[in-house]
Amino acid sequence: SLTGDAAMYDAGLEVAAAYVQVDSEIRPLLRGSIGLRYETADLSVKTLDIFAPTAAPIFSRSVSKDYLLPAATLTWNFAEDQQLRFGLSQTIGRPQFRELAPQRYRDTETDRILSGNPYLEDTTFVNVDARYEHYFSKGQYFTLGAFYKNMEKPVEALAVLGSDGAFRQTFYNAPAADIYGGEVEFKKLFELETGTGWVDNRRWLVSLNYTYTTSQLNVSDGDTITLDITGVPTTPTARDYLTGGEKLQGQSDHLANLQLGFENDEAGSQATLLVTYTSERVSARSSSVDLPDLVQRPGIRVDFVYRRNFEIQGREFTGSFEARNLTGTDAEEYQAAGGKRFDTNSFDIGQSFSLGLSARF
């Protein structure tokens, strides 16, 4: 954190909850479950003088909330190894302490000054999902799902340009948003018989996950947001900062993971090649609807990990080799408008290679 009047904070969350659930077979192959969770939470956050931590807090706020959270699922086992699952639930999401504490600190990942907003509220979710599941064997499956979420007061990041030309980031609750999309997962272990010892002696793995997500902010006339940029809370009109129909901050349309690997139990070796893709997303809102948002482009990344167990004089060792970011993908964050691009936090991540050795005692 940065030194200053409030370079330290103390925060706490105390939750008490009770739940009841009924699970029953409605008819052969059809099972239902319904439950209700009651939760009460006391949240407190205060900022302190680092040189006088026992003195009265510079700022203090406490909030108590009660929730009733219902949930229901319906599962149809229409085949021995296949089923359809439907779910409906209400859940909550709480801001992180660092998003709440009105204290400046430097984010080491973005090299940007961040300060929390103590007036953030919990996000409430209504979740609807449907999923088809096919299990080939233990730990091996194919699933296909669709989901919808309605969010009230989602937390978003806001980037404010300071007089020094650098961005300072804080947080706020957007009025509401809708998210919907689909997901496919596949995981398969198999052994090959090619007559080649190097191939035949290994158990091979293919794992794939792809998620498509789209979202939109819901902003109406009269909606406001609460900001704490200067130490004094303000409630500007939401339309000054947000446009209805925009994507949620932090949401990528496409997320994909491909994992290829093998295991050799006799040799004690394991290798994994991991390919990930994340499409562009809004990393932070700009301080006006007339200014472009900050956008990240994570792109494609490839990692490789190899491990092997061996013994030396009766002692067990594990050697490892790791290669990260083989594609050399750079970090990109920028604003774009009028066919021009201004990089706000773009840099070369580089590639990393490491060797490791561990002993078991």
What is the predicted role of each segment?
Residues 146-151, 168-285, 358:
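Gram-negative outer-membrane beta-barrel transporters
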Residues 1-81, 105:
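Signature of Gram-negative outer-membrane beta-barrel scaffolds
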Residues 27-29, 77-81, 125, 137, ...:
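Outer-membrane beta-barrel channels and translocator barrels
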Residues 44-52, 97-103, 110-112, 154-161, ...:
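Outer-membrane beta-barrel translocator domains and adjoining extracellular loop/strand segments
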Residues 20-26, 66, 74-78, 90, ...:
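Residue-level signature of outer-membrane beta-barrel architecture
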Residues 9-14, 63, 92-143, 148-151, ...:
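Outer-membrane beta-barrel signature, preferentially recognizing the C-terminal barrel domain
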Residues 276-286, 308-361:
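C-terminal beta-signal and adjacent terminal beta-strands/loops
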Residues 32-36, 70, 84-86, 141-144, ...:
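Transmembrane beta-strands of outer-membrane beta-barrel proteins
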